[in-house]
Amino acid sequence: MKGQTGLRSLALLYISPLYILERLPLKLSAPDTLVVRGSFIVPTEPLYPSITMVQTNLEVVDDTLHLPRILCLHGGGSNAAIFQAQCRRLIAQLRSEFRFVFAQAPFLSDAEPNVMSVYSQWGPFRRWLRWCPDHPEIRPEDAIRAIDDCLEDVKRQDDAKGATGAWVGLLGFSQGAKMCASLLYRQQIRQELRGRSFAGSDYRFGVLLAGRAPLVSLDPDLDLNSSLPDVSQITDAKYHGPSQDVLRIPTVHVHGMRDPHVDLHRQLFEEFCAPESRRLVEWDGDHRVPLKYNDVSLVAYQIRELATQTGAP
């Protein structure tokens, strides 16, 4: 009788998937041991006996379904599962306020070097944009369609899980941050020309981690007077401005001060985002997502401030 009571008590335990992930070794074989389900990362093979027992007896309840949603775009040569792991500390600080949904880029790619050093077994790796001549050429309209399809697919999948929160923000790292800024700029142009109800999206803010200039054009029919490169071009070289394409939707930019390309990140901040709507967080790190508590807290604070400023529900 006493043993049965103990088992029932064990079945009621809740172990956060983020708690599990933060205690795993850095070099994981993710496809073999983890599966991403909405906002959760759960083991598919026994990692530790106690975890297996709890997972077997417990149906995890997702308590973020009603929260406002932030769509997250990974960097080039990465993927959605890797980016979710990289953002685990940020999610932990904001999980009672926002639901984070991670999109998968449409095009296959080699792993980015920093990704390869930690997540070499987490492939396949993907990209949003071309960054080297070896990437196959593609027509701009086909690239835009593939990107939009990926984003709409992940939104529909999240709706199907029962999520109901408004899509209030975009969050991206590196190439994903460039995509987030470009998506916000497209929304801004559409809202100016068509009105807010016909823009196709209504994101209130963007969180741009190590995002580099320039923006890319995601709607050539509307950007008739734009000097932006199209989405099919290689755009990693320094952009020679000044730019007439200025994003006014509020953004927070996160720059690692030891990132070798921080000058390109500053160019996106200074030349492509309006002074009255941009914020900056600088931290002592290189080209990666912040993980230390104090660094993450600065980013989380600015996200809360943006949400308040923009009236995000």
Swiss-Prot record:
Superkingdom of the organism of origin: Eukaryota
InterPro entries: AB_hydrolase_fold, FSH-like_dom, LovG
Entry similarity comment: Belongs to the LovG family.
Gene Ontology BP annotations: secondary metabolite biosynthetic process
Residue positions of the active site: 174 (charge relay system), 259 (charge relay system), 287 (charge relay system)
Source lineage: Eukaryota, Fungi, Dikarya, Ascomycota, Pezizomycotina
EC number: 3.1.2.-
PANTHER family the UniProt entry points to: ESTERASE DBAE-RELATED, ESTERASE OVCA2
GO molecular function: hydrolase activity
Keyword line: Hydrolase
Protein name: Esterase mpl1
Cited SUPFAM superfamilies: alpha/beta-Hydrolases (SSF53474)
Class of this enzyme: hydrolase
Source species of the chain: Monascus purpureus (Red mold)
Gene3D superfamilies documented for this protein: alpha/beta hydrolase
GO-annotated cellular components: cytoplasm; nucleus
Function: Esterase; part of the gene cluster that mediates the biosynthesis of the mycotoxin citrinin, a hepato-nephrotoxic compound to humans due to inhibition of respiration complex III. The pathway begins with the synthesis of a keto-aldehyde intermediate by the citrinin PKS (pksCT) from successive condensations of 4 malonyl-CoA units, presumably with a simple acetyl-CoA starter unit. Release of the keto-aldehyde intermediate is consistent with the presence of the C-terminal reductive release domain.
